[in-house]
Regions:
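N-terminal signal-anchor/start-transfer transmembrane helix
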Residues: 1-8
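Membrane-interface helix-boundary motifs at transmembrane edges
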Residues: 8-21, 45-50, 78-90, 138-148
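A generic, lipid-embedded transmembrane alpha helix
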Residues: 20-43
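Central hydrophobic cores of alpha-helical transmembrane segments
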Residues: 24-25, 146-158
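Membrane-proximal helix-loop-helix units in multi-pass membrane proteins
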Residues: 58-126
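Hydrophobic, membrane-inserted alpha-helices
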Residues: 103-109, 127-136, 155-156
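Juxtamembrane boundary at the C-terminal end of a transmembrane helix
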Residues: 158-168
Length: 168
């Protein structure tokens, strides 16, 4: 679904004016998806047995959340005029940001249920991602949404760089 949104963003938007915004959201969410599956092995590698409730709350809820984010990401279709693409995003972005914030909250809490300890920097970045995601709910200007996108991408990529440095 996210790949379909990405291809729609590439095909249906003008890159210079607004297309980069939708494409960057799709790209950073694809990177988050890959990051989740990469982290999954790190978190669950030592687990021999999960109860059904641990499975539902941890990996299953994460995958459902990632899917819902891809559904709620308001990428315009080919029938949306380029002049109203920003209004299209602003009118439909609240479910996307709520789901994104809830997913990061779940990502921050879930490792504790299986006894996985995160570094203080990982925890701090997880809370920062929640704040950045939640702030998108309250914005009234498209410029603010651009800032949230850049802040979200910077925080996520910064978190990944720090995790890479810690593991090296």
């Amino acid at each position: 679904n996210l790949l379909n949104k990405f291809s729609d963003a590439i095909l249906n938007t003008q890159w210079k004016s607004i297309g980069w915004f939708f494409c960057l959201w799709c790209l950073i969410l694809l990177i988050c998806l890959l990051g989740y599956f990469w982290a999954f092995w790190r978190i669950y590698s030592g687990i021999e047995m999960l109860s059904i409730w641990e499975f539902i709350y941890n990996p299953f809820a994460s995958v459902v959340g990632l899917f819902l984010i891809s559904v709620f990401l308001p990428v315009p279709d080919k029938h949306t005029e380029s002049a109203v693409m920003s209004e299209h995003f602003m009118a439909k972005c609240k479910p996307f940001y709520v789901t994104l914030a809830l997913l990061w909250l779940q990502f921050g809490i879930a490792p504790m249920f299986v006894g996985f300890e995160q570094s203080p920097l990982e925890v701090a970045f997880a809370w920062l991602m929640i704040v950045v995601s939640t702030s998108g709910i309250f914005l009234k200007s498209f410029e603010g949404h651009k800032f949230v996108l850049v802040a979200f991408a910077s925080c996520y990529l910064g978190q990944e760089v720090i995790q890479l440095a810690i593991s090296s």
